[in-house]
Structures are given as C-alpha cells and as structure tokens.
Amino acid sequence: MESKTSTYLRARFREYYLTASMDAPPGMEAREWGFIFYDTPGMRRHRSFRSRKELVDYIRSTVPAHVYHSAAYYLKPDAPTMKEKIWKGADLIFDLDADHLAEYRGSGIRDFREMLERVKGETMKLLEFLLSDFGFDERMISVAFSGGRGYHIHVRDKSVLKLRSDARREIVDYLTGRGLDPERFIHKIGVDGDAGVERARSLRGPASDAPGWGGRINKAIESMVMHLRELDDEEALRLLKNVKGIGKQKARLFLSQIREENAIKSIRAGNLDFFKHASGIWNLIIPYIMEETVRALGGETDEPVTADVHRLIRFPESLHGGTGLRVTSLSINSLHAFDPLKDAVVFGDDPVHVEIIRPTTLELMGERFDLLEGKTELPEYAAVFLLARGFAEVG
C-alpha cells in the first residue's frame, strides 16, 4: 500500500471514529486490547483502559486500522506476558469465516455476497445449537459481523467463563458433529416375554422429540424414508444401492417395508425394528444417514479461535482495516435481515479518483462495479473498500 493511500484511509477512518458511539464490551477494564496500524508493522498489544472514554480517546487520537480486545478477563491485562496477566476467565467465542468453508478458500471479492450469505447461514445454524442444545439465554449471546468475511459469536454466560481449552474443544466437536458414534444413537433393547423373560431384542433409535443430535438424526431418517417412498422403484433402488453393503435384495426388502402404512409412525417413535432383518439393513444405512446429517446440519467454526482462552477478537463498531466495513453488533433477531454490503457501509458517495491495480467486480450499496486496470472515479464507499483490500491506490 502506497503512503498516500494509507494517509487517505487514516483520514477517512478518523472521520468515522470522531462520531462513532463505540460501546465498550462488558468488563472492558479487565480485557487486553490490541491495535494494528497502516504505517506500523505488527500489533501494538498489552494495552488496557480504565474507561470507555479513555479507550475512545485513544482510538480517535491514533486511528488504528484494526482494533481488538481479548475474550479473556485478566487481573493485570496490560502485563507483558500471559503469566503475569493472571487469567480470570474468558467469554466463549466462535469465529465463522469463509476461509473455513472449502468452496470459498482463497476466493476473491467477486464472490463476496454469495460467500457472506453462506457464512450467515452457518452462523444461524450454530446459534440454534447454542440456544436449543446448550440452553444458553439469548441475552447472554451477542453476534457481530466481522467487517470482513464472516461473523463472530460471543457467549458471556457464567457457566462458560472458567472453561479451559479442552472443554471448549469438546463444545466445538459437538457443534460440528465430529466423532458422533452411531452406537450412541442406535441400539438394541430387550423385549419381555411371559413371566418377564426376555424373548427378543428390538432395534431402537432416537425418537422425533429426542434432544440434540438424536432428534436431528430421527428427522433425517424420516426425511430419507419419505424421499424414497416418493420415488419410483428404479430410482429408489439405485439410491439405496449407493450405500456400502446394500445389494439389490436388501434394497428391495427395505423399500417394500418403508412403504408400509405404519413405517413413519414407528420411525418417529424410535422403533426401527418394524420388519424382518431390519437390524442388519439399518446398521448399514444409519452411518450413511449420520454422515449426511452432520454434513448438512453440523456447525462450521474455527476451533483454534474457540479453544484459545487468550484470543483477541475484533472490537464491535470499529472498522476493519482490510475492507473499511464496520464490525457491526447484531441481535440474534436482526441477523437474518442484515445485509453487510449495505448495513456495514459507513462512508458516503462523494467521488474519489483511484487507480485500479487488480481488475475485479464489486457489489456494494446495491451498485455493481466491473473494474479494469487503470484510473477511474468511484463513490467513496467503494473506493475505501478497494483501497483497503489492495485492489486500488489513490489516483
């Protein structure tokens, strides 16, 4: 980045910060703060502030490109080493970023809207886990658009404050469905005969109202069965034979039985043993269903971020130095309607002369820009974005 470009960006950022509200996070005085500047390499960290005013005055006077605070709370947040800081606990945080989604790794800004919509979907999925499976109070959860390629979730419930890294990794494992064992959900139970003597063993799965992954797996089983029932025999048999270990004979048996009137009712009750030889067939199908369920319903998040109890994360209402977009605080209810390419834009539309150094296509504020190398004039909001991203220099 040329010096005239960084000077221009600092001027625009200062303009924003002079009027931005910048509400401090809970316990701000116990958090470590870090800053990255356009004209200085590395991060300036191990800072602490006793009040919101002190923090805001610092940001307005120094105009950083990026502002971070720790998820952790410390006795001495400005101490130079972690040991000296004395850790008191940390929020449970989740970083959902397009880089965690295989189809968007290394993608440019051409796919920005589609990419952000996909990450928003993953964020909403993870929030559902936190609210329904873990039972966190919605008031203890905050969400923020990162200003870049994703979203952050902060859980500030007392129950998570003292969790160490291994416990936080276990939470990520649950959210992502990593290591789910079919035997945990599918098992045989004894069926009593005369005088209490066990006469048989029946295959059981989770019922439709089972909590957590159990309920999700039941609904996935029902969904698969309903789909197979709607297909003609040839197509249904073809799909079943894709499951390892299921040949034509087993596929025909399974298909005929799931088309029986009581099949769906039995599945919803968790009874999978409603036809002869059911056990052997279900034992082949269930792992396949679970794999597909985890792929479709499991959350996506950056495990190292969640597990790191000393992590720094972006300060909501600050600007992202790599886009010029605002790190935007959101309620869970407002997330669905939030459009980061409009709602996180803070700059106006005054014309700015820039030189495009990398051809690109950009969509911001409902406008599409198809840009080739060379000098051009852009509205300020688009110019700031491209300058911050390194696609342009001040003309």
Swiss-Prot record:
The active site is at D95, D97, D302. Its EC number is 2.7.7.-. SUPFAM superfamilies: Prim-pol domain. It is an enzyme of class 2 (transferase). The keyword Metal-binding applies. The keyword Transferase applies. One of its GO terms (cellular component) is primosome complex. It comes from the Archaea. Keywords: DNA replication, DNA-directed RNA polymerase, Magnesium, Manganese, Metal-binding, Nucleotidyltransferase, Primosome, Transcription, Transferase. Transmembrane segments: none annotated. InterPro entries: DNA_primase_S, DNA_primase_ssu_euk/arc, DNA_primase_ssu_PriS. Pfam families: DNA_primase_S (PF01896). Signal peptide: none annotated. Its cofactor is Mg(2+); Mn(2+). GO terms for biological process: DNA replication, synthesis of primer. One of its GO terms (molecular function) is DNA-directed RNA polymerase activity. Heterodimer of a small subunit (PriS) and a large subunit (PriL). Catalytic subunit of DNA primase, an RNA polymerase that catalyzes the synthesis of short RNA molecules used as primers for DNA polymerase during DNA replication. The small subunit contains the primase catalytic core and has DNA synthesis activity on its own. Binding to the large subunit stabilizes and modulates the activity, increasing the rate of DNA synthesis while decreasing the length of the DNA fragments, and conferring RNA synthesis capability. The DNA polymerase activity may enable DNA primase to also catalyze primer extension after primer synthesis. May also play a role in DNA repair. Belongs to the eukaryotic-type primase small subunit family. NCBIfam families: primase_sml. This is DNA primase small subunit PriS.
